[in-house]
Amino acid sequence: MARKLFTPWTVKDVTIKNRIVMAPMCMYSSHEKDGKLQPFHMAHYISRAIGQVGLIIVEATAVNPQGRISDQDLGIWSDDHIEGFAKLTEQVKAQGSKIGIQLAHAGRKAELEGDIYAPSAIPFDEQSKTPAEMTTEQIKETIQEFKQAAARAKEAGFDIIELHAAHGYLMHEFLSPLSNHRTDEYGGSHENRYRFLGETIEAVKEVWDGPLFVRISASDYTDKGLDIADHIGFAKWMKEQGVDLIDCSSGALVQADINVFPGYQVSFAEKIREQAEIATGAVGLITTGTMAEEILQNNRADLIFVARELLRDPHFARSAAKQLNTEIPSPVQYDRAW
């Protein structure tokens, strides 16, 4: 039987050489606090391309300065950021990988000086700053900032854009009734709470015709929060808008007890793939090639997003191939070892 983990996957005009995706993970390493890439970022991402990862998604990258989780996050709110990202995309592609970027706004989870913003003036927890409720004008401005960030990502040479609508950040905050208590057109019903994400998707697509992913938190793990049924509905709307893949994570909107085990989020990807009829990515404690192959062979997801295991092992693709008794190409410089 062919090893599906090492088969290509094509979305629009982008072909990823295998099904392994480096999930976006914040490195908090923009030490000049200007949102720009540092030498560490170049080494970090390029090394995973050398390690034969099919698609590398750059960590949550803020569309405005107050949209950062911390002041050491990456940013793409200025044309000054384009040059660094262009160098990164060129080098990653030179090693045979595709590269995407996750566009993000931290919302009420921003840990910054000055005002922070959210759909409603509800802090993340008792220790967190209370955000200012966004005005309609600020919402429209933020949507335009996502659009401008997408245009910069295109100029920098990215293959794929992912919108971050998970983990309790701004887009997720609009979606969930736990964090969105608005009474205007951006709050209340499912349709209204989806409006911010939906309008952002439309704005991004005005300047971006490449593959578009959205990361979601498929469950808030608490009463009156979002669950998988809600996200199946949202995924259907995203598909209608032209989103190509749903990256299925979960949690982090509020403090919650989560039963974590290997592959604990895979069922979310499976259900959305089946019921919304859209491609999905599975993520969360997927640490072996055997586990990844099972997910793909049973059509539970289309791509495997690997996070911490790729921090531990930049050559995860090689390790997975050995586990699956299959051969994959190696960088010519590494032939003597592989």
UniProtKB/Swiss-Prot annotation:
Per the record, the domain of life is Bacteria
Q: List the disulfide bonds.
A: none
Enzyme Commission number: 1.6.99.1
Tell me which Gene Ontology terms the entry assigns under biological process.
Answer: response to toxic substance
Sequence positions that bind substrate: Y28, H164, A165, A166, H167
Named cofactor requirement(s): FMN
Q: Which UniProt keywords apply?
A: Detoxification, Flavoprotein, FMN, NADP, Oxidoreductase
Binding of FMN, residues: A60, Q102, R215, A307, R308
State the Gene Ontology terms under molecular function. FMN binding; NADP binding; NADPH dehydrogenase activity
Q: Does the keyword NADP apply?
A: yes
UniProt xrefs under Pfam families: Oxidored_FMN
| Transmembrane residue ranges | none
Provide the catalytic activity annotation: A + NADPH + H(+) = AH2 + NADP(+)
The top EC class is oxidoreductase
Q: According to its UniProt entry, what is the function of this protein?
A: Catalyzes the reduction of the double bond of an array of alpha,beta-unsaturated aldehydes and ketones. It also reduces the nitro group of nitroester and nitroaromatic compounds. It could have a role in detoxification processes.
Q: Which HAMAP family does the record match to this protein?
A: NamA
| Family according to the record | Belongs to the NADH:flavin oxidoreductase/NADH oxidase family. NamA subfamily.
PANTHER family found in the cross-reference section: NADPH DEHYDROGENASE C23G7.10C-RELATED
Q: How does it assemble?
A: Homotetramer.
Output this protein's name.
NADPH dehydrogenase
- The protein's organism comes out as Bacillus velezensis (strain DSM 23117 / BGSC 10A6 / LMG 26770 / FZB42) (Bacillus amyloliquefaciens subsp. plantarum)
